[in-house]
Swiss-Prot record:
Record-given protein name: Putative dehydrogenase XoxF
Residues at the catalytic site: 318
Keyword Glycoprotein: no
A cellular component annotation (GO) from this entry: outer membrane-bounded periplasmic space
Cofactors (names): pyrroloquinoline quinone; Ca(2+)
EC number: 1.1.99.-
Record-stated family: Belongs to the bacterial PQQ dehydrogenase family.
One matching Pfam family: PQQ
């Protein structure tokens, strides 16, 4: 397979940036090198054309300034920079700060929502929020209690607010909301409470509901056409979801949407993934449990589905499919294709044609993945696109109240929501990963609204017979399905990556280090330990002719839930407390933004 088409890739990246950086999106200066969207662009590449900081001088980085958020617990996502203002968010209670970059980060305004603290009890993997969005002079925030708020970017005044869920039954909001054209796309969290997943599109002008697409249930609620919506090129047929569940289990069947969304303006398609089916005990939900664990492509205006691909039918290990979809234009076997690349929790990296939903590549991006021997890639096979499950590691085949040991990866996946980056200069994807395995014992559980609906006991540990650590940072070829290089880390890499035109890739570690590495080789070029563990995403911007790099630190998330919530039982945090127990020897709770610069 041939290398990527650099020009085509850059054209896609710039089209996404232009769509955001006009008067209706990223406003004040069309050419300003801002950070106007959480993922850098609609294609989710997390790539910046800034190159003032490069592989030759990054060793000279120093701290330019810091800002305390005043909130502990896990800080995911990143700030936004629009013109001369930086917008910073926090985990619950979801504060928002507007900082003046022309005046030493002076607080221009702050927003402090009043939320019922009882919502904390139903946030299964810490009180995180993955970041703000910007559109039409408004800062868009999704609060933990499922309220979407539009704030005037200049004053902080509430323009409108809309509540899209019910925390009383376990529904929360942790994913960033994404403005696309005249809509705001909003997911929902709560799969561990039997929440039925859905995507809601609100009208940008007033927050009213435009459309809603469920992950499970009747065709009319899925927003599918049984004859034209396809799965691997074939029509899904009538009642595709209902036929894959026993009875009414689909009504509490999960498939929640709490990851990242991408958008192709040429195809007018939105891409995202759905989460695990509920419960975690597979014996209680026979069937493929459609459309959980699925990549979805939908029309941005209507929500109608063009195609689906279910990666892990009848999920037995909590391998949510919510991770980001990265969009690139590439040449494959001599033909230019519009591609989508997805690094799933299940340990497989998928490359697909994002226009048709054709599956092109499905390979393990950590060699220790053992629950499957691989995906059937024969389009003429009855099992085309399905992973072949290894019986030894099948929690369904081993049954209830049986402890299935040595499953790789653990439930938190080879990668969770921490986003990868893509560089059109190297044609590589840079992926923060978890190198963790687990023991998994399912048990029968009854559904009660607002109570945990898990049904499994887990323990986690570093992948055996390896380097002894719990993470790697890798460079990946998406058209060949190969790792170019891998950097071992003591703990999972729970930070989002950033690639730049300076031939540098940045990421953070759970101990709290910001690390830039050489994009070609993975060689570490510098490191600085911030006050707390990093689960935020690295971002960069230019202000006053100077490039800066920013990162939120504040340990937490699933991997750091023991520290964040003060838990000590090894089985708590769905097994993460025991697996990451030694993290407390390296960091503590915090909540700080650290901004770096070069001298001069």
């Amino acid at each position: 397979m041939k290398n990527l088409m650099n020009g085509a890739c850059l054209a896609l990246l710039m089209s996404g940036t232009a769509a955001l950086a006009n008067e209706q999106r990223a406003g004040r200066d069309r050419q300003a090198p801002q950070w106007a969207i959480q993922m850098g662009d609609y294609a989710n590449t997390r790539y910046s054309t800034l190159d003032q900081i490069n592989k030759d001088n990054v060793k000279d980085l120093r701290v330019a300034w810091t800002f305390s958020t005043g909130v502990l617990r896990g800080h995911e996502g990143s700030p936004l920079v629009i013109g001369d203002v930086m917008y910073v968010h926090t985990p619950f209670p979801n504060r928002v700060f507007a900082l003046d970059l022309n005046d030493n980060g002076k607080i221009l305004w702050r927003y402090e929502p009043q939320q019922d603290p009882n919502v904390i009890a139903v946030m299964s993997c810490d009180t995180v929020y993955r970041g703000l969005s910007y559109a039409d002079g408004m800062i868009l925030l999704g609060q933990a209690d499922t309220t979407v708020v539009a704030l005037d970017a200049t004053s902080g005044e509430v323009k409108w607010s809309t509540k899209i869920g019910d925390p009383g039954i376990g529904e929360t909001l942790t994913a960033t909301v994404v403005p696309v054209k005249d809509k705001v796309l909003v997911g929902i969290s709560g799969g561990e409470y039997g929440v039925r997943g859905r995507m809601t599109a609100l009208n940008l002008t007033d927050g009213s509901e435009a459309w809603k697409a469920w992950s499970t249930g009747p065709d009319e609620e899925l927003l599918v056409d049984p004859e034209t919506t396809t799965h691997l090129g074939k029509p899904i047929g009538a009642d595709s979801s209902l036929n894959s569940w026993e009875g009414d289990q689909w009504q509490i069947g999960g498939g929640t949407i709490w990851g990242w969304f991408s958008y192709d303006p040429d195809l007018n398609l939105v891409y995202y993934g759905t989460g695990n089916p509920s419960t975690w005990n597979p014996s209680q939900r026979p069937g493929d449990n459609k459309w959980s664990m699925t990549i979805m492509a939908r029309d941005a205006d209507t929500g109608m589905a063009k195609w689906f691909y279910q990666m892990t039918p009848h999920d037995e290990w909590d391998y949510d499919g919510v991770n980001e979809m990265i969009l690139t234009n590439q040449t494959v076997d001599g033909q230019e294709r519009k591609l989508l690349t997805h690094f799933d929790r299940n340990g497989l990296a998928y490359t697909m044609d994002r226009e048709t939903g054709e599956l092109l590549v499905a390979e393990k991006y950590d060699p220790v993945v053992n629950w499957t021997t691989g995906v059937d890639m024969d389009p003429n096979s009855e099992t085309y696109g399905r992973p072949a499950v290894v019986a030894e590691y099948s929690t369904a085949q081993n049954g209830e109240d049986e402890n299935t040991t040595g499953v790789c990866p653990a439930a938190l996946g080879t990668k969770d929501q921490q986003p990868a980056a893509f560089s059109p200069k190297t044609n590589l994807f840079y992926v923060p990963t978890n190198h963790v395995c687990m023991d998994y014992e399912p048990f029968r559980v009854a559904y009660t609204a607002g109570q945990p609906y898990v049904g499994a006991t887990l323990s986690m540990y570093p992948a055996p017979n390896s380097h002894g650590g719990m993470g790697n940072f890798i460079a990946w070829h998406n058209t060949t399905g190969e790792i170019k290089w891998s950097v071992p880390e003591q703990f999972s890499v729970w930070s989002g990556a950033l690639a730049t035109a300076g031939d540098v890739v940045f990421y953070g570690t759970l101990e709290g280090y910001l690390k830039p590495v050489d994009a070609q080789t993975g060689e570490e070029l510098y490191k600085f330990k911030t006050p707390s563990g990093i689960i935020g995403n690295v971002m960069t911007y230019e202000h006053g002719g100077k490039q800066y790099v920013g990162i939120l630190s504040g340990v937490g998330g699933w991997a750091g839930i023991g520290l964040a919530a003060g838990l000590t039982n090894p089985n708590d945090g769905l097994g993460a407390v025991g697996g990451y127990a030694s993290l407390s020897q390296y960091t503590e709770l915090g909540g700080q933004l650290t901004v770096f610069e070069l001298p001069g």
